[in-house]
Structures are given as C-alpha cells and as structure tokens.
C-alpha cells in the first residue's frame, strides 16, 4: 500500500508531509469568532397618544431650544386672542396683515374645513397614532385626518417636491430623542388669529418618552425670517392609551352656518 500523502497528491515532498501532518494533528490555532456589534435599539414611540396638558415642560428638551425663541402657550383648545401672538415678534408687513384678520372669513363653507399645517395642527386637542419602523415613522393625526411620514433613511426632497400642509420631514435619532426637520409646508396659520407662516418656514421637532414610557414629550420649534424677528416654540405632551385608534375627522362645512358675523344695528 502506498503512502497516503503520495496516494493523495501523487508526490510528497518532506516539507509538505510535515505541513499536512501538522494540519491533520490539529495543531493550527482556531480562527477567532467574528465580533458582531449589538443591534442599535431606539425607543418605541408607536401607539395611540392622547393630548395631556397636565405635563410640565421637559427641562432637557427646553434647553435645546435656540436663543431668541418665544414660548407659545396655546396648546390644546386654548386660543390666543386677536393681537396676541404669544411673544412672537412680527415684521411690519406680517403685523399689518394680522391686524386685518377677520375670524368670520374662516367660518364660511369654503374655509370651514380647510386644514392648517402641522405648525398649528400638532398642538391641537386631538389624539395622534404613531407607527414606527427602522426606515420611517408615520404619525396619523385625528385632526383633519392628516398623515405625516418621517423619513429615517437620510433622503432629501427633490428640487420639485410639492408643498403641502404636512410638508417633507426627515428625521434622525439623537440618543433617545427623535429629531425631525420639516420643510415644504404650504402657508397656513401659526396662532389662528391672523398670523400665517410662509412657504419658507422651517420646523424642528424633538420627541422623547418619559422615563416610565407612558408619556410622549415634544417641542416644536419654528423659524420664518420672512415674517418673524425671532423663533417660536411649543411644548406638547401626550399620554399613551392602549386599545385605541384615531377616528375619522369628518369635517362638515355646514357647521359654518351656525356662525354669522354680527351686523351693525341701524339707528332708529
């Protein structure tokens, strides 16, 4: 019977015999197992969230607000009266337009169901529902059936991306905080009393969970240099409620007929 090395290779040199023998005897060091990084996990914001006006402002979120920013305290059903813009410093043309505001123009069949932009809608007294994945987050508002898509993959809007009331939102995680930047918004109200933002408004939102995960906390900061000398910010909080979903808004423009502008009485 021939040598097994010769039988396998045909010809075996002495060095080759030693090498193969070493392999056969198992003296080679085993390869190190590859190091697998732990998957990055982020807070789960998904679920049904109802507005909660009892939550105090979050100090960590408020510290990230830019200087020269007015805090607008109108979250929920609260409305600022005419002429009160929550500390926002209006430029002359914007102030003049706001002074001409007539609330009854909103209470017409053609305007009664006109949706605001997210600048005003996010703080409204209606719940939201969040669906979350690694690529995007969807926020469904009950208010005016608005749906927001927050892209997490780094994409940017095309040059001809259309403006809308929800705009284009790109998002990223900063630790446990979701940071969202929104542009491409159609002009719409800021304070529902005559002050409208332009199509160039830029909105920065930060979302985080409370330590117990039962509250969703957010700031909404916006800048619109065409009409404002400073920035504005709102603080908004929601509480999580299991087994709930947002309802259709179903705005009926007919309700505008319940509101008519008072007419001056003719002198007798």
Label each PLM-derived region with a short phrase.
Residues 10-22:
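Bacterial N-terminal signal peptides
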Residues 1-7:
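N-terminal secretory signal peptides that target proteins for export/translocation
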Residues 3, 21-27:
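Classical N-terminal targeting signals for secretion and organelle import
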Residues 25-268:
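PEST-like low-complexity, intrinsically disordered acidic/proline/serine-rich tracts
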């Amino acid at each position: 019977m021939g040598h097994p090395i010769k039988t396998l290779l045909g010809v075996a040199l002495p060095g080759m015999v030693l090498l193969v023998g070493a392999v056969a005897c198992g003296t080679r060091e085993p390869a190190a197992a590859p190091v697998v990084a732990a998957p990055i996990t982020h807070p789960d914001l998904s679920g049904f969230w109802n507005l909660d006006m009892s939550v105090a402002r979050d100090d960590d979120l408020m510290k990230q607000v830019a200087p020269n920013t007015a805090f607008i305290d109108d979250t929920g059903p609260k409305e600022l009266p005419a002429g009160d813009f929550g500390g926002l410093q209006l430029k002359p043309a914007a102030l003049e337009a706001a002074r001409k505001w007539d609330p009854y123009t909103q209470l017409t069949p053609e305007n009664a169901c006109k949706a605001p932009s997210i600048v005003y809608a996010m703080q409204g007294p209606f719940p939201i529902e969040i669906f979350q994945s690694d690529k995007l987050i969807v926020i469904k508002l009950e208010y005016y059936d608005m749906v927001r898509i927050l892209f997490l993959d780094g994409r940017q809007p095309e040059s001809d991306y259309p403006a809308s009331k929800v705009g284009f939102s790109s998002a990223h995680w900063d630790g446990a905080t979701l940071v969202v930047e929104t542009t491409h918004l159609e002009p719409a109200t800021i304070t529902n009393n005559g002050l409208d933002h332009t199509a160039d408004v830029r909105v920065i939102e930060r979302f985080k969970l409370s330590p117990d995960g039962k509250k969703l906390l957010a700031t909404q900061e916006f800048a619109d240099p065409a009409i404002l000398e400073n920035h504005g910010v709102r603080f908004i909080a929601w509480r999580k409620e299991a087994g709930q979903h947002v309802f259709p808004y179903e705005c009926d423009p007919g309700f505008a007929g319940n509101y008519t502008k008072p007419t001056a009485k003719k002198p007798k």
